[in-house]
Amino acid sequence: MEEIIKALQNNEIIIVTDDENRENEADMICAGEKVTGEMINIMAKYARGLICTPIGKNIARQFDLEMMVKNNTDNHETAFTVSIDHVDTETGISAFERAQTIRALADNNTKASDFRRPGHVFPLIAKDRGVLVREGHTEATIDLMKIANLKEIGLCCEIMADDGHMLRGKAVVELAEKLGMKMTSVSEIKKYIKENNLDFSKNEENFLEKTNIINLPTDHG
């Protein structure tokens, strides 16, 4: 298989599936720091789900992003913060303005006051130890960003079928082949982290000094 991490570093969209006994869903995922309007448009067109922006806790603290609700009763406790738009956007909803807002999260010069609340970008806070403690697409996204030495800001979007139901199984593989997207799974990411003794909570700054490109094996070739 061609490298998942290299694809993310090359600003490509990949597909990540989760466990059949969890959500049993597939998400399109990409890095946030260089995301383009064209990439968000691809997600909106071919994935069709809610485009969200997984972030690390440090990013949430940096921009004072509070939780959307105090009492989270979501089935999987998805950690939505208040939604945002960058102040330089107009309505904030276009693919290009959403990309502008997300790139601003990765800009060291951006301040908390540079975002309007609520908005059209939906940050999700990943747990510190990632998929080792929560096997969700939020954590998978941020774990992949860390492994790839990218900023802890990504995008994920659930993939729906033409009929509006969730795309699953062989149909996900067929879509990945059609769009030329690399594919992996949450379980494969978790296995890689365990095999390489990566504990993200111990050294958030430089836990991956050893490699820039990692060959991440998958069941999909």
Feature locations, PLM:
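Catalytic domains of riboflavin
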Residues: M1-G221
